[in-house]
Amino acid sequence: MTTYFDKIEKISFEGEKSTNPFAFKHYDANQVILGKTMAEHLRLAVCYWHTFCWNGNDMFGLGSLERSWQKNSNLLAGAEQKADIAFEFLNKLGVPYYCFHDVDIAPEGNSVREYVQNFHHIVDILERKQVETGVKLLWGTANCFTNPRYMSGAATNPNPEVFAWAATQVFNAMNATQRLGGENYVLWGGREGYETLLNTDLKREREQIGRFMQMVVEHKHKIGFKGTLLIEPKPQEPTKHQYDYDVATVYGFLKQFGLEKEIKVNIEANHATLAGHTFQHEIATACALDIFGSIDANRGDPQLGWDTDQFPNSVEENTLVMYEILKHGGFTTGGFNFDAKIRRQSIDPYDLFYAHIGAIDVLALSLKRAAKMLQEETLQKIVNERYAGWNSELGQHILQGKTSLETLAQLVQQKDLAPKPVSGQQEYLENLVNQVIYS
């Protein structure tokens, strides 16, 4: 295998006392927690786009990162070299999965014919590398937002020919995902939204994207894809307002088009921040609506109004996220994909390892703390007591539709009900959480 990161062999677990920057302090893949290993709980994945495609550019500056494979004048040869380096990284980091967009792995070319040929060529290579390394595909997707043809959207575009081009990419990306054993297929509508309502037909665009998603579901069943379809919510950026604003919005959309049993959500932490929610809120909402699927692990900056895609570094935040996931029974086909990028000034190639090692340890420690909270029923006992009244005859009659507004009004008057407020104990609960996290 090509050696690009020749400074290290393989990242291993050395424990909390280790000072080796190229070692895990908390992530022991084989440690059993609540009946499953850490690896089985976390199902870690590295993303192709930020890790191997981004060159460090931003809106105000050119690329700052030295990536030899990006300098190859033969774009297809550069993509082959990128695949070599990507799988070297994945193998040395020791994660079980990776994720990609179609044009992350292969150059788009100048025609649909070139696009298909290039994509299939690299998929052949990825298939061989998966066999060689044992690394698997968590999910694939199609980039239907970067090319200028998508400036007015993909499925929501006013031109049906653009809709057809997006369908072509999704068709090929879904087929490749199935071929590579991908466990999910993600749909992120990067430009499925609007800049101004002055030139937008909201009803029409909603119907267009609804039909597009129905076609995706139809194709899934046609080819026998056994993985999970996922929509990734995001409120804005690059458009002013996106139709998949947050988890609750996506659920309403799925219900409208009869897709709530077919598609779940891939939740990104930074997107929750942009939507004005906590990461925990979005996870809890998805679990409550039974559409929780997978996670893009990263963090945003509350002081900034854009997608910073930083690596997760808060055990406090992720313990509560992990707690919600464990309560829900954990992942089925989903996992933690690091949709995160190193900072533009992090120009050492090994900064990629530092970033992923630190983030993986954060999730591992968060898992251990969340498992302790779940086992000790630290919070659940108080929540159960708080809602105990709904297990009474009155509560059950209300929920089962055995009473009415009139009946309840009569009951309150007859019994002169005067319910007394009970403390929510928020401060006490916060203390309990901190006690678990910092013990």
UniProtKB/Swiss-Prot annotation:
Active site location: 101, 104
Chief localization: cytoplasm
Keyword Metal-binding: yes
Compartment list: Cytoplasm
Binding site for Mg(2+) 2: 268, 271, 307, 309
EC numbers, comma separated: 5.3.1.5
Catalyzed reactions per annotation: alpha-D-xylose = alpha-D-xylulofuranose
Family classification: Belongs to the xylose isomerase family.
Subunit-level organization: Homotetramer.
Keyword Cell inner membrane in annotation: no
Protein name per its UniProtKB record: Xylose isomerase
Gene3D superfamilies reported in the protein's UniProt record: Divalent-metal-dependent TIM barrel enzymes
Cofactor remark from the record: Binds 2 magnesium ions per subunit.
A single GO BP: D-xylose catabolic process
UniProt-annotated binding residues for Mg(2+) 1: 232, 268, 296, 339
Organism of derivation: Haemophilus influenzae (strain ATCC 51907 / DSM 11121 / KW20 / Rd)
One example GO MF annotation: xylose isomerase activity
Cofactor: Mg(2+)
Alphabetical list of SUPFAM superfamilies matching this protein: Xylose isomerase-like (SSF51658)
Gene: xylA
Keywords, ordered alphabetically: Carbohydrate metabolism, Cytoplasm, Isomerase, Magnesium, Metal-binding, Xylose metabolism
Enzyme class, UniProt record, top EC level: isomerase
Annotated GO CC locations: cytoplasm
